[in-house]
Amino acid sequence: MTRNEEIMTILQEECAEVIQAVSKVKRFGMSENHSALVKELCDLQAMIELMYEFQVVNCTIDQKFENIFQKRQKLKKFSRIFESNS
């Protein structure tokens, strides 16, 4: 397995662990699962950063911000996340 493959494999595993942590929050509540969710999100963020650090993927800061902006625009249109009463 190459380094890039290993990074992507661990990234995939971390995504699954975030899914599991979110599921536990939904089932049992945030107060009992907050620290586990934070840990898994940080682990995922670490792997995302390694994807860029080792140039498994690359893009400019401007491209990152534009993609994030576009996602937020979609969420504003198709979800209720940004509504004041959510």
Roles of regions detected by a PLM:
Residues 1-41, 45-86:
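Flexible "arm" and connector segments at domain edges
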